[in-house]
């Protein structure tokens, strides 16, 4: 897969994007080492699989390796990067490994502002159900993989394509899925035009016989379609798409809808995950399996009916005393709005949203969109911004989004500056039949279990 390379060192091996790559490389038989800032269960797993993993970063860790693999998040002054440059060691981006996987398979790449992980996971689960033995690489963790990737022997691969840093343009898939395009990742793209141009380039990487499965409801995707000459198959809720989800309704706790192709009802899907956004994600997965992989309808419907979601995607953390605690990765206004709407539709719960803003740049650029993203929540709690390594921006702080929400909707936002205080604050106000959702891309996922522990202690 990687000519002339045997010993590979991964910087940040335990990170959400790198762990999937590490697992593939170890299974392929490469001599893998890595480094990260802290111990974790996944690092222990890699050691058990034969990898050498160091805690901390040191220039000596790259001695004798043929290549190092990094992500965009790794700084240039990292001692292992510096040493690799000094020694002339090949430096690969994680997307180079994803490309190498796609190059030797019939590759499917899923991109978009939201829904990438869920859609990629659904496609993978369908192919597993159909005994296609796929290779799967995603940015989250799912139960059916017992992690975030698997190395298959079949000729299909399905990968999550990361547009955040432009690295998805290296990939050469045979099939592309674009779930949506929105004004995110402006720290990299600077302007919406640059982002749209990148997606146009992405579609142009398809071979002439390749297909782009895209959500035709999205205005930005329609713009890309007008710019690029490729075969597009559209899906969505609007009737002008090739594939349309209709008759969406709940049956008990299952979300059910019919798949229409050019006006003809061809299938009924039943999902265990909530929300219209998951209807769209599953519809995209259906089309890929049906149109591009030749999977029979019975395998598709069975797999989608078994799908319970990826970790940090409406993930149940537990129930104590009638309080249901869920965690979700939503950190963009559109994701937040969709997730809270889905939560409100489930049953008659009081929905308590606990949001940790992610990055100063995103907070600054999207504060007006954040202002109306929380309307489905009954109670709103917010913490200080999780910087993700960014420098502060003058005039942007933890009160920016709460103030915007209160001004736009007249809803009360409870501002709790320190995220460490969240569990104790919530423990005093929750009651039976509450649904608490922790939301954000930072450290907020650690605090739902802490709330549950306090509630459990209170019952003893």
Label each PLM-derived region with a short phrase.
Residues 82-90, 194, 205-210, 229-230, ...:
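P-loop/Walker A phosphate-binding loop and immediately adjacent motor/lid segment at beta-alpha junctions
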Residues 4, 24-30, 47, 61, ...:
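Phosphate-binding loop of NTP-binding sites
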Residues 10, 110-112, 438:
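Hydrophobic Val/Ile/Leu positions in short beta-strands of Rossmann-like dinucleotide-binding domains
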Residues 35-36, 54-57, 92-96, 137-140, ...:
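Beta-strand->loop->alpha-helix junctions that form or flank phosphate-binding loops
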Residues 1-93, 97, 219, 244-246, ...:
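N-terminal leader/targeting and accessory segments in enzymes
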Residues 371-432:
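C-terminal helical cap/extension that packs against the catalytic core
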Residues 2-9, 17, 21-28, 251-253, ...:
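Nucleotide phosphate-binding/pyrophosphate-handling subdomain across enzymes
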Residues 30-37, 212-216, 353-356, 378-387:
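Short internal beta-strands
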